[in-house]
Swiss-Prot record:
Domain of life: Bacteria
Position of the signal peptide: none
UniProt protein name: UPF0284 protein Cyan7425_0342
GO function terms (MF aspect): nicotinate-nucleotide-dimethylbenzimidazole phosphoribosyltransferase activity
Pfam families: DBI_PRT
Family per record: Belongs to the UPF0284 family.
PANTHER family: PTHR38811, UPF0284 PROTEIN SLL1500
CDD domains the record matches: DMB-PRT_CobT
Gene3D superfamilies per the UniProt record, alphabetical: 3.40.50.10210
Length: 368
């Protein structure tokens, strides 16, 4: 149920080390005004919808389907939120969940740890975040990474940031990686040209030195608040436990950022304790090159082989047409279910469709 795509020996050793262990799931919520650009993301049908995606996903992750949620899941162009997958695993396995608000314009309706961050301005400004905020969020990430590592055998670090694959492209490009046509998106065919134009604008307007900018300055110029928090958590947690960065393009960028920060800030970490885990919809997306990006960033890439080909729900079948693909740690959660409980295709699909059934019932009952 879990395929290794890059650095297979390291990836397999990591899987063997943590098989049978129950991780904690930390989901870091953030916001960038990049996500409001028309057409930039399919994680919400309109820019107005996308303002609420992260807080709606957070509420659903903890509470599951409810008759009258404070923030209902936003309508999508096609498909269903990946939080259905994440919630099915969290509830089925009893995963400890920690929600972190790294910088949201509206706080979630459920309990979340407020890290004192701020939403990012559009990366095209070249001034996405205040540098003081970036330093503060790195410190928070380091502190919480160490704290959680003291309590759990390994950490599953997920995210919800609409527009986050575009800020990921900006970070990867700024760090010197040739990522322009390799990233993914929530669209069935990745909008590479749109992303690249925005990234070029942001890097061009920023005060960064073109060759080898300092990583914290780079985040301040074109990043988002989630990235720096998860990079800090990864560095600190890796000293004691394993880290599964749950996501695709965004988590490859976080890994590259963590490595750059550890180097420039002279922070000790254990990169061999870290892997990226995603869905096969991301890993095998023909309109991106996740495997090539993982090879370039030099990290083991895992992918859950979860399939929705035979799902009863058209919204889930849409994943097989390239819609949505990943988010809210969905791929990492599926990997954790297979590692901890040996869940295969049938167990995962049954659990996810049970959540889908409940969601359909409460949506119909509330007129949603």
């Amino acid at each position: 149920m879990i395929r290794t795509y890059t650095q297979r020996a390291l990836a397999q050793a990591w899987l063997n080390r943590f098989r049978g262990h129950l991780p904690a799931f930390a989901c870091i919520l953030g916001f960038t005004q990049t996500g409001l650009i028309p057409g930039i993301s399919a994680a919400g049908a309109t820019p107005a919808d996308r303002q609420y995606t992260a807080i709606a996903d957070a509420e659903f992750l903890l509470n599951g389907p409810q008759p009258q949620p404070r923030y209902p899941l936003p309508p999508l162009t096609a498909g269903a939120s990946p939080v259905l997958i994440s919630h099915a695993v969290v509830s089925g396995l009893g995963l400890p969940v920690y929600l972190f608000n790294a910088g949201l314009p509206i706080p979630p309706a459920v309990s979340a740890i407020d890290l004192g961050g701020e939403p990012a301005r559009c990366l095209s400004t070249g001034a996405a975040l205040n540098l003081a905020t970036v330093h503060h969020l790195l410190t928070q990430g380091l502190v919480w990474g160490e704290t959680l590592a003291d309590q759990h055998p390994y950490l599953l670090l997920g995210e919800c940031v609409v527009g986050g694959t575009t800020t990921a492209l900006a970070i990867l490009t700024g760090l010197g990686y040739a990522a322009a046509t390799k990233v993914n998106s929530s669209h069935p065919i990745c909008n590479h040209a749109q992303k690249w134009e925005i990234v070029q604008q942001g890097l061009g307007r920023s005060p960064l030195k073109p060759s080898h900018p300092a990583p914290l300055d780079l985040v301040a110029a074109v990043g988002d608040p989630m990235q720096i928090v998860v990079a800090g958590m990864t560095i600190a947690a890796s000293r004691k436990v394993g880290v599964l960065l749950a996501g695709g393009t965004q988590m490859l960028a976080v890994y590259a950022l963590a490595r750059a920060i550890a180097c420039t800030e002279q922070l000790v970490w254990q990169p061999e304790a870290v892997v990226v885990g995603t869905t096969r919809w991301v890993a095998e997306d023909p309109t991106g090159d996740t495997v090539g990006l993982a090879e370039e960033t030099d990290i083991p890439l895992l992918g859950s082989q979860l399939s929705f080909v035979r799902s009863r729900f058209p919204q889930l079948q849409a994943y097989e047409q390239g819609y949505v693909k990943e988010g809210v740690g969905a791929g990492g959660c599926a990997i954790a279910a297979s590692l901890y409980r040996g869940w295969g295709q049938q167990e995962l699909l049954t659990a996810i469709e049970a959540v889908g059934d409940r969601y359909s019932q409460v949506s119909a009952g509330s007129g949603g």
